[in-house]
Amino acid sequence: HLLQFRKMIKKMTGKEPIVSYAFYGCYCGKGGRGKPKDATDRCCFVHDCCYEKVTGCDPKWSYYTYSLENGDIVCEGDPYCTKVKCECDKKAAICFRDNLKTYKNRYMTFPDIFCTDPTEGC
């Protein structure tokens, strides 16, 4: 669920997700096209691809269960859809954390009209 994803991002990065990631680069937030602008934008590209692979459920609005153990996100539960969605969100949140050093403020509210490179496939 998007609210759970927001909490994961906040825990992993310390950043406010809506301000920092909702409009970042060419892939963070709604939609996505062109070539990812940097490693953080690539996290969003990979997250979009991960969601595309989850079939038979709506990854953005279904709730899942997770916990934090020693700073690590642990996805819990049995239903396939919820577990896989949690794993997609977990990987993206960790990716954001791992790329904090290369986060660029200039991509924070990047207009998608500048995302003109050919779109990569998953």
UniProtKB/Swiss-Prot annotation:
Active site: 47, 89
Functional note: Snake venom phospholipase A2 (PLA2) that displays edema-inducing activities. PLA-B is three times more active than PLA-A in edema-inducing activities. PLA2 catalyzes the calcium-dependent hydrolysis of the 2-acyl groups in 3-sn-phosphoglycerides.
Positions that bind Ca(2+): 27, 29, 31, 48
Catalytic reaction equation(s): a 1,2-diacyl-sn-glycero-3-phosphocholine + H2O = a 1-acyl-sn-glycero-3-phosphocholine + a fatty acid + H(+)
Family: Belongs to the phospholipase A2 family. Group II subfamily. D49 sub-subfamily.
GO molecular function, one term: calcium ion binding
SMART domains: PA2c (SM00085)
Location(s) in or outside the cell: Secreted
Record-annotated disulphide pairs: 26-115, 28-44, 43-95, 49-122, 50-88, 57-81, 75-86
Keyword Metal-binding: yes
GO biological process: arachidonate secretion; lipid catabolic process; negative regulation of T cell proliferation; phospholipid metabolic process
E.C. number(s) listed in UniProt: 3.1.1.4
Tissues where this protein is expressed: Expressed by the venom gland.
Organism listed in the record: Protobothrops flavoviridis (Habu)
CC terms in the record's Gene Ontology section: extracellular region
Record's protein name: Basic phospholipase A2 PLA-B
